[in-house]
Amino acid sequence: MAYRGQAQKVQKVMVQPINLIFRYLQNRSRIQVWLYEQVNMRIEGCIIGFDEYMNLVLDDAEEIHSKTKSRKQLGRIMLKGDNITLLQSVSN
């Protein structure tokens, strides 16, 4: 049985989450972490380490409160992967 368009092969590229985290680490990107069940608080910092459970070691970390726009310096922290909802790169 022949299907139309069989001659055209579409290659799909999938980016593994661990590869994206590794890219953030290599590029020393500043990232923002949205926290699970903490909608009014975000964490920003540079990834300097991580593991297969998505636990992150962040350097120059800051706690950011969305409502008050206040920032609290945290320094170097380890954030458990269970607390992470979203990771995104932010410009300095």
From Swiss-Prot:
GO CC, sorted alphabetically, is:
cytosol; methylosome; nucleus; pICln-Sm protein complex; precatalytic spliceosome; SMN-Sm protein complex; U1 snRNP; U2 snRNP
Q: Which residues form a coiled coil?
A: none
List the Pfam families hit by this protein, alphabetically. LSM (PF01423)
A GO term (biological process) for this protein? mRNA splicing, via spliceosome
Q: Which domain of life is it from?
A: Eukaryota
Q: Which CDD domains match?
A: Sm_E (cd01718)
Extract the GO molecular function terms from the UniProt entry. RNA binding
Matches recorded under SMART domains:
Sm (SM00651)
**What Gene3D superfamilies is this protein classified in?**
2.30.30.100
Glycoprotein among the record's keywords? no
Q: Which PANTHER family match?
A: SMALL NUCLEAR RIBONUCLEOPROTEIN E
Q: How does it assemble?
A: Core component of the spliceosomal U1, U2, U4 and U5 small nuclear ribonucleoproteins (snRNPs), the building blocks of the spliceosome. Most spliceosomal snRNPs contain a common set of Sm proteins, SNRPB, SNRPD1, SNRPD2, SNRPD3, SNRPE, SNRPF and SNRPG that assemble in a heptameric protein ring on the Sm site of the small nuclear RNA to form the core snRNP. Component of the U1 snRNP. The U1 snRNP is composed of the U1 snRNA and the 7 core Sm proteins SNRPB, SNRPD1, SNRPD2, SNRPD3, SNRPE, SNRPF and SNRPG, and at least three U1 snRNP-specific proteins SNRNP70/U1-70K, SNRPA/U1-A and SNRPC/U1-C.
State the family named in the UniProt similarity comment for this chain.
Answer: Belongs to the snRNP Sm proteins family.
Protein task: Plays a role in pre-mRNA splicing as a core component of the spliceosomal U1, U2, U4 and U5 small nuclear ribonucleoproteins (snRNPs), the building blocks of the spliceosome. Component of both the pre-catalytic spliceosome B complex and activated spliceosome C complexes. As a component of the minor spliceosome, involved in the splicing of U12-type introns in pre-mRNAs. As part of the U7 snRNP it is involved in histone 3'-end processing.
Instruction: Name it.
Output: Small nuclear ribonucleoprotein E
Q: Which organism is it from?
A: Sus scrofa
